[in-house]
Amino acid sequence: MNNFDIEKTLSTMVCLIDTRERDTKEAEKRYQALGIPYRRQKLFAGDYSAVFTLPTGEEFSMEYLCCIERRYDLTEACMCCTSERNRFIREFERAKEKGIKMYLLIENGSFEKAYNGQYRSKMHPNALIANLTAWMARYNAHIIFCKADTFPKLCREILYREAKEILTNMEVDT
């Protein structure tokens, strides 16, 4: 693809939001803050991905290439290591089997807060850190901490940049 076609394709970005992501007033604000159109559909893995329209008119979906899993805070991340562990691991395994690049964005947290136990869970900080770093090693997951109001911008930017890299290296008949 030439640069013009890549830019044209990227301008058609629609964020895909998993139907299992809770649909609340706060979530609606987050979706609006993405600054691009969005649609809800069941995703294979993760909470967010993207779809684009190629110059040929065909849809180019990132669903099986890149996804973002969102957690509200470290307390919710702890649940991924305890009560929701099996479901969470299955999701990472599914993504790994398909070669999907997985990002885990944790709002309102940091590694410093994790090390200092600044979350509401009985989980020991060492156990939380061990889980987070094991996921990075085992599943090639990218764990990023951000503020809640940064999430929509960062989500959009990650999906945009991932798509741009893929499109730049992709051979498509236009």
Regions found by a protein language model. Name each.
Residues C66-Y72:
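Conserved catalytic cores of phosphodiester-cleaving nucleases, focusing on short active-site segments
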